[in-house]
Amino acid sequence: QSQKKIRHVQGSHIITEKLYKGEQAYILQLNDKRIIFLIPYLDKYTLIGTTDHEVKSYDSPKITDIEKEYLISSVNKFIKNKITEDNIIWTYSGVRPLVEDLSENASKITRDYTFEIDDKDAPILTVFGGKLTTFRKLSEHALDKISKYIKISNKSWTGNEILPGGEKTTDLNFLIPEGILPRLIKTYGHKITKLNQYYQGFNDGGEHIFNDLYEFEIKYLVLEEMAKTSEDILFRRTKLGINFPKEKLPNLENILKKYL
């Protein structure tokens, strides 16, 4: 049994209306030696993060009042038009599984990952720590570790691999109206050609749900991208849920049921 221990450190973000003009991002250096970032988000918002808040469990992470106050007060030291909690439009949180290194401060705990192989019987590789921004390097190192047990190449190959939807497209004959095309291209990339096929199967894209969300996109997300719930559609596949009205939710769920 491994002697390594994991500490759960929550990171939370807040989204506000756009705080500044331009497409540049900012990294703010704070007095506590931490940094937070401001990033343009979905054209009309600003994403602010992140925090280091140690928690006992990783179930249902949710931003705390302390985290909100920390982000708000930190940003207000750098901007002219101060923000309050009333300016927060949406929040999201996640929990980092960090390897215990006896640091007293959660922000000081190492973000590095480490491996442990037990090959007494059937070999098993355990990965401790890591974070989203290093997932590719972590995965390559993990494959390198297990390559001596199974027939798999340990050569690095993902650095130049095109991400899904990143391929060039020569199909520019879109039937999707220009008014809703920019968001779809930005969201789906090359997969817009497949989405265009779904649009053709409806009269004007099918039932209109809200803003630029139509039935054809719902059908695509269910059949092609494994969306199962309204939350999948509004937050995990798109971020349309940020300003999606609650009264429109029953209509969305009724359409969703047609394709499940």
Summary of predicted features, one role per range:
Residues 3-48, 53-247, 251-260:
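C-terminal catalytic lobe of FAD-dependent flavoproteins
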